[in-house]
């Protein structure tokens, strides 16, 4: 076969791959074919590897897209969390949650503890694990969510915005109960929490014991209703009072001296 004929074939394959939106196939078919010859692979093994590369690239791009669409303030994975610096945390339980069973069962997860104890990191880590499982995820703070819902209500767009929040397979509400909110705002937040109860998962981080949530929602009846929805079948993980960030920094300094 002439060099010119081979060049035409390669160009045709690239065009076919482009038409079929098989970017990885178009970009790697030649190098993988050369590698297959070196490894003495058969045609089926080569084709399996080539299509496998396409599938893997699409999966990785999908994960990256879902992570971007989730609006994490910072990407933090559970693999990055130094459980050795927080031995009081139930590492096995958290890793089990990362497998995603709570998502299919629409169970809430609540991280409760002082500032700096790793709540946001672990919540983000679970959410990124969900992105890897092809779930639609959205991260927000309680204040951001309430502001968005209040603005939507003022613009007569509350139903549209609320429905969008219901479509996510997982939402993370960070910094719940950090600041008090007006009753009207608390009612809007309750709509989201109640609407997702037993339908879709939610992860919440808070620095307040449940007995003190009336500091955020002064209306005792509304506060109780919100807690009832959030804690029903919930995985409640207490992160304690000792700063994970401080201990991690301290251990790094000790390690550097060694």
Give the location of each predicted region:
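Conserved P-loop
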Residues: 89-167, 216
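AAA+ P-loop ATPase motor domain of ring mechanoenzymes
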Residues: 48-101, 105, 243-256
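Walker B motif beta-strand of ABC-family P-loop ATPases
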Residues: 170
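Charged, alpha-helix-enriched surfaces in structured cytosolic catalytic cores
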Residues: 8, 12, 20, 24, ...
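Interdomain "pre-motor" coupling segment immediately N-terminal to P-loop NTPase/helicase cores
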Residues: 14, 18-74
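Intrinsically disordered, low-complexity and often Lys/Arg-enriched segments
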Residues: 1-15, 252-258
